Amino acid sequence: SPHAVARAICDVIGTSTAALRVCVVKALEALVYSIARVRDLRKAKSAKITLGKAIMDFEFSDEQELLREQARGFLADNCPPMAVRKVLDSDAQYDAELWQKVVEMGWTATVIPEEFGGLGLSYLELVVIAEELGRAAAPIPFSSSVYLATEALLMLGSQEQKEKWLPMLASGEAIGTFALAEGNGRPAASNLKTAATGGSVTGRKIPVADGGIADFAVVVAASNQGDGASLHLVELDQSGVSREAVRTLDFTRGHAAIDFANAQSELLGGDGAGWAAMESLLDRAAVLFAWEQVGLADAALEQARDYAMGRYAFGRSI
C-alpha cells in the first residue's frame, strides 16, 4: 500500500517526521491515481478530450500499440526481474547482452534520421519504448546514450559531427553520455568549474551516468560568452581523460567520476549558448524519464495487486 511504501522510504532516509510521511503518502496516492487514469484512457474506445472546438487525442496509434506489445514481450523474455537483480547485485555496470539485443531491435536508432542510419521515427515511438524499459528496470545505458547524447547531436551537432557519431549511435557501435554535475549542489552556469579553452576541456564531472562505459560525453563547461556555458563533445578514450567508478543510489546503471586534463574537445552549438541548449535538452529528456517512471510504477502496482489477490492470512484472502 502507499502507506507501507511511505514508511519504508522514511525508514531508509532516517526520519520519522509525521509531515514527511504525509507528503510521501499523498505523492504516492497521486501517482497511483495517475496510473489508473492512464489505464482508463488506454482501455477506453476514445481517449479524446474536447476543449471548446478543439479535440485533443491522447491515443497511441495502432502501430505504436504494436510496438508496445513487441517491446513488452521482448523485455519479458530478455529482462525478467531475476536477470535485473543479478546485474544489480554484481559489479557489472550494465547488462551487455541485453544492450546488444536492444541494439539489434533497432531501439537505439529510433529517432535518428534515415540519412544517418536511423529509423526516422517520432518522439512518440521513443516514449513507448521508454515506458517499457522503465517497466522492466532495464540496466542498460539507453537513457544516457539515446535521450541525452543522441538528442544533443541531433539538436546541436554540425553536419560533420552528425555524420561521424549518429550512425555509430544507431548501430550501437558507440555509447554516449551527458556530463553536467560537479558534485554536491544544484548545477548553475555561474558555479561551473569545468572550463574549455582552445579546443580542450579541463575539470571534474561527478557523477556521470554510464560514464565508465561511454565512448564520448557531451560536457557542460563554463564560458565567458553569452549565458556562461557551452557544450563540448569529448571522446573518453584519450590520454587527457581518467575515469573512476562511483556508487550512487541508482543501482540500475553505473556511474563514474570523470577527470578531464586538457582533453581534446569539439564545440557543440554556439559558444555561450550552452546553458539554454542544455535546459531544452533536459526538458525533452525529462518527458522520457517520466514515462520510464510511469512504466516502473505501473509494474509495481500490478505486482502488488497480484500479491494481494493471492495472499492469504488468517484463513482468508487479504
At which residue positions do the language-model features occur?
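Short terminal hydrophobic/aromatic SLiMs and anchors at protein ends
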Residues: 18, 33-35
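Glycine-rich beta->alpha junctions and the first turn(s) of the following alpha-helix
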Residues: 58-70, 135, 241-318
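A short core secondary-structure module
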Residues: 179, 204-242
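A structural signal for short hydrophobic beta-strand segments in well-ordered beta-sheet cores
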Residues: 194-196
